[in-house]
Amino acid sequence: MSRSSIPASRRVSRAKAQAFMDSLTGSSYFPNSRRIYLQGKTPSVHVPMREIKLHPTLIGKNGEHYEDNQPIPVYDTSGPYGDPTIAINVRTGLNRLREIWILARQDSEPISNNNNDRQSSDKQLSFTTNYNPRRASYGRCITQLHYARAGIITPEMEFIALRENMGRERISSNVLHQQHLGSNFGAKKADHITAEFVRQEVAAGRAIIPSNINHPESEPMIIGRNFLVKVNANIGNSAVTSSIEEEVEKLVWATRWGADTVMDLSTGSYIHETREWILRNSPVPIGTVPIYQALEKVNGVIENLNWDIFYETLLEQANQGVDYFTIHAGVLKRYVLLTASRLTGIVSRGGSIMAQWSLVHNQENFLYEHFSEICKLCAAYDIALSLGDGLRPGSVQDANDEAQFSELHTLGELTKIAWEYDVQVMIEGPGHIPLHMIERNMTDQLKYCHEAPFYTLGPLTTDIAPGYDHFTSGIGAALIGWFGCAMLCYVTPKEHLGLPNKEDVKQGLIAYKIAAHAADLAKGHPGAQIRDNAMSKARFEFRWEDQFNLALDPFTARMYHDETIPQTAGKLANFCSMCGPKFCSMKLSKKIRNYTNMKNIKTISNSFMNKLDNSGIKNADR
């Protein structure tokens, strides 16, 4: 498409994205925060965290003295973009963090780089790499699962252990370490996550570390039931809208707002080029659905798809560095007929493509037929498989039907095959499921898929709220995360309506970070409650700035507060506009606490209540 034929609104969006890329620098971004690094035993292991600095607590009304509040370290997915000391240049990409570890293992070798041959001749579109991709040396297996089964603790595992503990050893306050036990439905909770624990979980197949050796820019992370619940963000262009600049902007924006992984679901023009820009600039693992690009190669004609074209696409993406593939190998021909009576049929793009191909050719799904070959390729690059739920329900009416669970059983069979090749596996799940039917999805997945990590889209709990499906799905996501789901795929406000923009990405991520964190609290994940306790303490002490800064979205929290009390004095007030100065429950509760401390009262009695007259309360307001 020529630039002159692009609608004006699209040109503006693209220009804004280009300006964002050109001006991008490492930045702490969030107020009163700084980048810190946790040092591992291995000298090259430095784990990034964001540390939120807090204000001291005023003890006494007239400022008799202050008590310090320790800074709160939080998990940070922003990579180099969150470090103001790092120079960012999206045209050269990020630092190749894991390359030193990959080379030290001496079990992979460079291969000729033909990726540049696939790039557009337009220099504005192409990202020219100056390195050769690698693959496993002959006879070697290089997956994190292989290392874990061999008893090897890799630097990636050490990195992850530090990251999952979230720097909580830096906090000495007993108040902040208070936590409810939670209920984890039989999960294996560790009070302190060690590199050995990470190794054991990966070896058992209960967790995966997506880490293609050709994406050394990514920072190690783990997806598993016994770790923090993760969130994936989907980006990617379509045949109708978006550009490379906008997708790179969305990538950076997504990692800033907490995306643990990102999937590039591009289906429009320049799929290869878009993916290269994303990979070279991504500090988080990148997933794809390869069938989309394979279909583009046959000009969208499904019956022209074949195994050779698909395998060529896998190889191309493997050499670029894709960390996990969604493969719809469980959509068997006999299961397709089970969807005929559904209200909404097959709603997965990949699932519908393979279903149509099977029916047109009257043949079994070629992804299923060639699954062992897919595994061999993945083992040579350490690409994880995300076994797609091509028959997931697209409406609450179709939830938990025979087609859905038949496919799930097949995904369990494929999981065992992948493990024979030491390939890491996770299982994708629904979809649209009403609340009372969600738990079965988790229990059946654990049973039939041998506790491989579960990765779900929501699920959406009702179908009546287009424009608010980040809410309808966030409810289901929190619940299934509590039951044991390892990663939640976000849903944006644009779900069912259109391609999400930058702001939609943020809204979807905030909703899903809330859901994931709520699940971690419910499971009793060690250290999950520290930030909540810090927020509650700041709220009770009317430290408004700290309340804003501890929030998932400090900017929105501050904006809402300042809509009614914008003055600087409002940040020092012992009330907000909801209750005002006379009816603030926390202000009154604080007076009661101060009074009991002043009078050394240990228990509440009728005589104590009688003492709480106006003069007593006023004197206690110190």
From Swiss-Prot:
Cofactor(s) demanded: [4Fe-4S] cluster
InterPro entries: ThiC (IPR037509), ThiC-associated_dom (IPR025747), ThiC/Bza_core_dom (IPR038521), ThiC/BzaA/B (IPR002817)
GO molecular function: 4 iron, 4 sulfur cluster binding; carbon-carbon lyase activity; zinc ion binding
Chain's role: Catalyzes the synthesis of the hydroxymethylpyrimidine phosphate (HMP-P) moiety of thiamine from aminoimidazole ribotide (AIR) in a radical S-adenosyl-L-methionine (SAM)-dependent reaction.
GO BP annotations listed: thiamine biosynthetic process; thiamine diphosphate biosynthetic process
Record keywords: 4Fe-4S, Iron, Iron-sulfur, Lyase, Metal-binding, S-adenosyl-L-methionine, Thiamine biosynthesis, Zinc
Subunit structure: Homodimer.
Entries under Pfam families matching the protein: ThiC-associated, ThiC_Rad_SAM
Entry keyword Calcium: no
EC number: 4.1.99.17
Sequence positions that bind substrate: N234, M263, Y292, H328, S348, R349, G350, D389, G390, L391, R392, E428, Y455
Pathway annotation: Cofactor biosynthesis; thiamine diphosphate biosynthesis
Listed name of the protein: Phosphomethylpyrimidine synthase
Name of the encoding gene: thiC
A cellular component annotation (GO) from this entry: cytosol
Sequence positions that bind Zn(2+): H432, H496
Residue spans crossing the bilayer: none
